[in-house]
Amino acid sequence: MAKLALIEREKKRARLVAKFAAKREALKAIVEDQSKSEEERYEARLELQQLPRNSNPTRQRNRCAITGRPRGTFRKFGLARNKIREIAFRGEIPGLTKASW
């Protein structure tokens, strides 16, 4: 199981991304808008750089909801592969069965 501090750090990043999402999108739109003056675009770029680093969605890491494992996490379930296997064998995920051919 991942350390609790790492899990909490990811939760904090998710909160920051949600908090600054609208502002970040507005600033990026200004930066990419060719009809704006160079000065306006430059100011928007500087303001974008002043936002917290962790408010950037690329810094987020998908983690297992149960264990906090950062790798092997399935987006559809939000769980790590080994937890999906355990839960699926118990029959707790509807429609998910072990493959046989």
UniProtKB/Swiss-Prot annotation:
Keywords (A to Z) from UniProt: Ribonucleoprotein, Ribosomal protein, RNA-binding, rRNA-binding
SUPFAM superfamilies: Glucocorticoid receptor-like (DNA-binding domain) (SSF57716)
Record keyword rRNA-binding present: yes
GO terms under biological process: translation
Pfam families: Ribosomal_S14
GO terms assigned for molecular function: rRNA binding; structural constituent of ribosome
InterPro entries: Ribosomal_uS14, Ribosomal_uS14_bac/plastid
GO cellular component, one term: cytoplasm
Domain of life: Bacteria
Disulfide bridge partners, by residue number: none
Quaternary structure note: Part of the 30S ribosomal subunit. Contacts proteins S3 and S10.
Similarity-based family: Belongs to the universal ribosomal protein uS14 family.
Stated role: Binds 16S rRNA, required for the assembly of 30S particles and may also be responsible for determining the conformation of the 16S rRNA at the A site.
NCBIfam families: PRK08881.1
UniProt cross-references to PANTHER family, sorted A to Z: 30S RIBOSOMAL PROTEIN S14 (PTHR19836), SMALL RIBOSOMAL SUBUNIT PROTEIN US14M (PTHR19836:SF19)
Protein name: Small ribosomal subunit protein uS14
Native species: Burkholderia vietnamiensis (strain G4 / LMG 22486) (Burkholderia cepacia (strain R1808))
Lineage: Bacteria, Pseudomonadati, Pseudomonadota, Betaproteobacteria, Burkholderiales
Chain's gene name: rpsN
